[in-house]
A protein has these predicted regions:
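Conserved pre-catalytic core of RNA-dependent polymerases
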Residues: 1-90
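Short linear motifs embedded in intrinsically disordered, charge-biased segments
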Residues: 256-258, 262-361
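Basic, alpha-helical interaction scaffolds
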Residues: 115, 180-250
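Catalytic palm subdomain of template-directed nucleic-acid polymerases
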Residues: 36-52, 106, 121-145, 166
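Short, conserved non-catalytic motifs in the polymerase core
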Residues: 1-11, 28-30, 73-100, 124-129, ...
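Active-site palm subdomain of RNA-directed nucleic acid polymerases
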Residues: 98-127
Length: 361
């Protein structure tokens, strides 16, 4: 089945939290490829297509799509530059661009856990007992070798490192790429979501609340321009609410009441603007006027639907679920459920979707 950014985020968060719950530490590097799509070598890409036994005619079609592309530059007041033929790069905005890049980096397999989502690459090393040494520098050398062999470039100044787990592992030696020391961060924006080394979501909630509130400005201007309540509501549902809900099943399980209230406050303000209500108007009343649910209710619904998706054996996240109970055991339970709740050692594991979603059985 398809793999979205949410699937990728859930997968890596599960790896982190289960490792931390087992008493291990996690060292993660967020890799930034310099001009990733622009540096894809056409000849190397075609060779990789052939190595994957792609039909010859399809390879020819790819070759026709990639080769003989040219570009030139024009500055206002000056004539065009000479045409220049390109031997690399993917056309911006094309459907084949992301697919081609995925094929290009498919053979990037360092000896550690790696998350690849188009041009976002994340390396994760699980470090065991306190005496265990980190091998991440070795993994980075492998990555650098691959990059050089494939005419790709790693941007050391934008590649970041994060350590999750015991504070005693913060003294791990610094990492370098091409003599550039990687910055160690406590918060990083991964696939649109701010993740932190303590696996709390305060930074992300602050970010999405601020972003959504800034868009209320446009809602007010549209109202002054005379748009109907229906059109204003459509604007909110399509432009503002998605900001508050992106990847919500990932962070909903450990959301605090205060954080949840801050999210609801944004929706309440938007509805008050649309329906000319005051701050004293009950929230439940404006929800009824708009015929929509609270954000908390929608997050629960999104989580239930994701759980139903994960339960499908062909789901890319199906392996994250605990082993199902024996049917004979299930039949003797007062409240029969297919999947048992995983046992945990720490509160960290409660933030994993596989732990939280078993409640939706």
């Amino acid at each position: 089945m398809g793999r979205s950014t949410l699937h990728a985020l859930v997968s890596i968060l599960h790896l982190w939290t289960t490792s931390l719950d087992a008493g291990q530490s996690v060292r993660t590097v967020f890799v930034d490829f310099r001009k990733a799509f622009d540096l894809v070598d056409h000849n190397i890409l075609l060779r990789k297509l052939q190595e994957k036994s792609v039909p010859k005619q399809l390879c020819k079609w790819f070759e026709s799509f990639l080769f003989q592309r040219r570009q030139r530059v024009r500055v206002t007041g000056y004539p065009h530059s000479q045409w220049l033929f390109l031997n690399g790069g993917m056309p911006q905005g094309s459907l084949l661009g992301p697919v081609s890049f995925i094929i290009h980096i498919d053979d990037l397999q360092p000896l550690c856990d790696v998350l690849k989502y188009v041009d976002d690459t994340t390396l994760t090393e699980i470090i065991g007992p306190k005496s265990s040494a980190s091998a991440m520098q070795c993994f980075l050398e492998q990555l650098l070798t691959w990059s050089n062999n494939n005419n790709m470039q790693i941007n050391g100044s934008k590649t970041k490192e994060m350590i999750l787990g015991s504070a005693s592992r913060r003294d791990l030696p610094a990492l370098t790429i091409n003599d550039t020391h990687l910055e160690r961060v406590s918060v990083f924006k991964l696939l649109g979501v701010y993740v932190s080394s303590d696996l709390r979501w305060e930074t992300h909630i602050e970010y999405i609340v601020s972003k959504a509130v800034s868009r209320l400005y446009f809602l007010k201007h549209l109202k002054r321009a005379g748009l109907t309540q229906l059109h204003l509501l459509h604007f909110y549902l399509s432009v503002i609410r998605p900001v508050l809900e992106y990847a919500s099943p990932l962070w909903h399980p450990t959301l605090t009441k205060s954080q949840s209230d801050r999210l609801e406050a944004v929706q309440r303000r938007a509805l008050n603007i649309i329906f000319c209500c005051t701050s004293a108007t009950p929230y439940i009343f404006t929800l009824a006027l708009a015929d929509i649910s609270s954000l908390q209710g929608r997050r629960l619904d999104h989580s239930r639907r994701l759980f139903q998706n994960i339960c499908q054996v062909d789901s890319c996240l199906h392996h994250l679920l605990p082993l199902p109970r024996d049917p004979a055991v299930t039949s003797r339970l007062r409240k029969p459920t297919k999947y048992p709740r995983p046992s945990i050692r720490t509160a960290k594991y409660c933030s994993t979707l596989s732990f939280a979603l078993v409640n939706f059985q």
